[in-house]
């Protein structure tokens, strides 16, 4: 596989990828994908996802919709709204009952690991989806206050010292299931 997993490091990540050594293989894979037969079946099928596809799916389908500024419509004209409205908190069946998705700003070597967010809130770990149910949001100080909370869960991010912090996705991962569960 030529894809590099995201890491919180510098250009040494690119240098170690051996891009030139993978040119032929990557080109062959691209041609193979272009000529792959289209799925024409009806109904259910088995789909095997690479980890890079799974983390992108979680990022887009759970991360962005649970950014509380998006839920409140702050980004409606730019990036859309969310199905995870506040009246659905602790009620919305977001996934199958055995699914747990954890936000964790303390995860070692995570892309969004920090000691404090960009509003000075200490890094935390919390369930966004617990047993398949919407359990919490990604908040900054403003959205946490609007939700009636005394503090944020530390999801504020600014891309520079001169930018206003916004709610952004922390390290968001699928938690392993219980031993013996096979779904």
Language-model features, listed with the residues they occupy:
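N-terminal small-residue-enriched
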Residues: 1-183
């Amino acid at each position: 596989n030529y894809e590099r997993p995201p890491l919180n490091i510098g250009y040494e990540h690119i240098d170690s990828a051996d891009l030139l050594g993978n040119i032929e293989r990557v080109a062959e894979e691209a041609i193979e994908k272009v000529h792959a037969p289209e799925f024409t079946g009806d109904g259910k099928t088995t789909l095997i996802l690479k980890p890079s596809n799974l983390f992108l799916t979680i990022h887009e389908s759970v991360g962005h919709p649970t950014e509380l500024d998006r839920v409140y419509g702050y980004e409606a004209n730019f990036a859309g709204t969310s199905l995870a409205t506040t009246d659905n908190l602790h009620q919305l069946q977001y996934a199958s009952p055995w699914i747990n998705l954890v936000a964790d700003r303390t995860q070692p070597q995570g892309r969004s690991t920090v000691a404090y967010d960009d509003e000075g809130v200490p890094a935390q770990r919390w369930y966004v989806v617990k047993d398949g149910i919407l359990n919490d949001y990604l908040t900054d100080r403003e959205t946490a206050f609007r939700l009636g909370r005394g503090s944020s869960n530390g999801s504020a991010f600014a891309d520079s010292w001169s930018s206003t912090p916004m709610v952004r996705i922390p390290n968001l991962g699928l938690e392993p299931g219980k031993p013996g569960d096979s779904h």
